[in-house]
């Protein structure tokens, strides 16, 4: 009987802790979305691209969305251009500032197609881990994103390559980690102002994908099905 009472008390305490955690947002534990790790690993496991010294060099900088369509772009331009994606996932502008010069290397790039935004606008904990809680801050708020992107553009312009900025692709409600659908348009608007001021060509993947999300994008996910990645590649 004593053990039974003790067990009841333990259950009551645990229940109270769970309820308190839920009220304070701690119950929204991060669940990684399908696609990002999978696409990044797939890219890393691919054989190095064979370089044709007589063909122009094209660098694609971006996150897992661009990793998803780079292979299709490479197929489309086979025999016409060397298409390279930056190693791994370019993630947000903070990582971009840290690694851009390394990604550029000493290659003479003819075209650089780039994007940042999807990781900047996602919500993270104070320690920087992905969060499903919209009350948590964004990885880079709009002001920080704007400042970072301006500096990245400055560095990219120094390469003398033809620059093309791809707008951040849209996504539905309920993606994990937390990204509010309306933020993609806000971050794109800030980016477009920077590109306009620097006479940089735009590739509006946001407008291309928006009316077709239900058929081309994974359910409650920022990543695209194979056909969706192919569609993006055709416009790239």
Language model segments and positions:
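Bacterial N-terminal signal peptides that target proteins for export
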Residues: 2-13
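Alpha-helical cap/lid subdomain in secreted, periplasmic
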Residues: 5, 76-82, 95-235
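Positively charged, low-complexity intrinsically disordered regions
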Residues: 6-8, 24, 29
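Short hydrophobic/aromatic segments of transmembrane alpha-helices and their interfaces
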Residues: 9, 49, 212-214
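Bacterial N-terminal signal peptides
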Residues: 11-23
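A generic, residue-level signal for flexible/boundary positions that often mark functional hotspots
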Residues: 14, 59, 216-218
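Generic detector of short, well-ordered, non-transmembrane alpha-helical segments enriched
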Residues: 23-24, 141
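Serine-esterase "nucleophile elbow" of acetyl-processing enzymes
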Residues: 28-112
């Amino acid at each position: 009987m004593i053990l039974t009472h003790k067990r009841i008390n333990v259950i009551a305490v645990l229940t109270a802790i769970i309820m308190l955690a839920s009220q304070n947002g701690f119950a929204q534990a991060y669940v990684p979305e399908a696609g990002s790790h999978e696409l990044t690993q797939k890219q890393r496991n691919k054989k190095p691209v064979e370089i044709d010294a007589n063909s122009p060099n094209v660098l694609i900088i971006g996150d897992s969305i661009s990793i998803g369509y780079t292979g299709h772009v490479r197929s489309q331009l086979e025999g016409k251009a060397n298409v390279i994606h930056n190693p791994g996932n370019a993630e947000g502008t903070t990582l971009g500032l840290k690694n851009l010069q390394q990604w550029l290397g000493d290659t003479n790039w003819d075209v650089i197609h780039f994007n940042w935004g999807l990781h900047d606008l996602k919500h993270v904990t104070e320690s920087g881990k992905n969060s499903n809680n919209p009350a948590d801050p964004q990885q880079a708020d709009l002001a920080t994103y704007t400042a970072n992107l301006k500096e990245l553009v400055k560095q990219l312009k120094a390469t003398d390559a033809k620059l093309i900025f791809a707008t951040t692709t849209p996504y539905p409600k309920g993606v994990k980690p937390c990204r509010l659908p309306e933020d993609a348009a806000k971050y794109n608007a800030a980016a477009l102002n920077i590109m306009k001021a620097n006479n940089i060509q735009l590739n509006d993947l946001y407008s291309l994908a928006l009316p077709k999300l239900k058929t081309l994008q994974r359910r409650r996910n920022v990543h695209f099905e194979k056909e969706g990645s192919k569609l993006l590649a055709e416009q790239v």
